């Protein structure tokens, strides 16, 4: 009988030899021949194995979309993992102080359904592709594998998998936590890796009840949102993708971002904050939008500042006309375009949000915000693309009453009449009104805060008056300078004309003198000849 040391020695030699020949096989045997060998090896295993394997990958459609089946299976297996798996991953969930456990990578659990036992395997494959920037960047391709005896094939495919997907979807809805997403640079994401978007839990407290806006206007927006959320069959009947566009425009501080948060809380939707300046090109933009989920709001804030999307098509013709008559200077060089600069175009954005690609998934709201709606290209905000245009204006009396109730818990005050008059005369944003109403210490009560607002409104009115006077003064000075320049130009013109007249008279006199001298010379010549 061999000793333990000898056994380990033989084992080590065998493993070393196997690793050596495996390395030779991987390095020197052509890839197409290896594929041929592996194909027949798996076929041979299939002949002698009584088990069937079904693979569920994390991403489908060539890595463009996340698999809903994979997510449902993950939720289902998470409910089984606590009692069955040996290695677990722990995560927090909303409204719960306890942890939720799921299968760790390369773990397996056994499940039973109607007396039939099956096995689930959690797998991840890490590869090292060559990135565009010459660096080695890892990709993780995750998948679940279901293994069962082949005699149960019909029951597993027709009944068990339907049960798993249904249960997993229900668990996902129960544990769903709304999230706020932001897009990553394409250097950080790959087709099989969930790296296109980063997310954090979305816990913004804004609601329509706390939103400083006219109640009738708020009610109209809420009805529109409810109609949209229940309109799946209606949109299908009229032949439109199940999406809706909102344009929020108005001065800074008027509540555009708060409105987005209120919509998300009202509909229980996720929010995708799309930063266009980090998107490399139109193709990357499409991939980002395809990787968003249904029941979500896609937001592009301050779109008038995002790339060159503001009326560029109208300006193009004007610029071309101006350049027609200009000659290029010799040796003039065009500025180099930075390769890292975003190349997203207006047409690319329009096609992504409203073209054929927009119909790939439904129940989405697209929101644009801007401080200067007049700067935007009309094609970007036309009806049918941005269906609902909502002006977020300066604070008026109805909006003030909402703020007073939220911040001071009062619904009336002796100074309400004066505040209403001053709000009509003064442009003050809801954010500034809210900051003024907020108590700055425990000693400040509602009366102090209301009086402070009245004083602030008076100061703002005075500032506006002085600013208007300064603007009027500047305008008058500008007009005076313009008139002075016009007068100087007129005087210069008159002087030039007078100088030209004098030159003409002088030239005429000189010509007359020359003619007279020539005549005198002729007379003298005649006399000398005679």
Curated annotation (Swiss-Prot):
Annotated positions binding ATP: 250-257
Keywords: ATP-binding, Hydrolase, Magnesium, Membrane, Nucleotide-binding, Transmembrane, Transmembrane helix
Domain of life: Eukaryota
UniProt keyword annotation of Magnesium present: yes
Region (Disordered): 312-339, 463-530
Polar residues: compositionally biased ranges: 512-523
Obligatory cofactor(s): Mg(2+)
GO molecular function terms noted in the UniProt entry: ATP binding; ATP hydrolysis activity
EC number: 3.6.1.-
Alphabetical list of Pfam families matching this protein: AAA (PF00004), AAA_assoc (PF14363)
Basic and acidic residues composition-biased segments: 326-339, 463-511
Location within or outside the cell: Membrane
TM stretches of this protein: 5-25
Tagged with keyword Cytoplasm: no
Example GO BP: response to stress
Record's bilayer topology term: Single-pass membrane protein
Catalytic reaction(s) noted: ATP + H2O = ADP + phosphate + H(+)
Cellular component aspect of the GO annotation: endoplasmic reticulum; membrane
Family of the protein in this entry: Belongs to the AAA ATPase family. BCS1 subfamily.
Designated name of the protein: AAA-ATPase At3g28510
Gene source species: Arabidopsis thaliana (Mouse-ear cress)
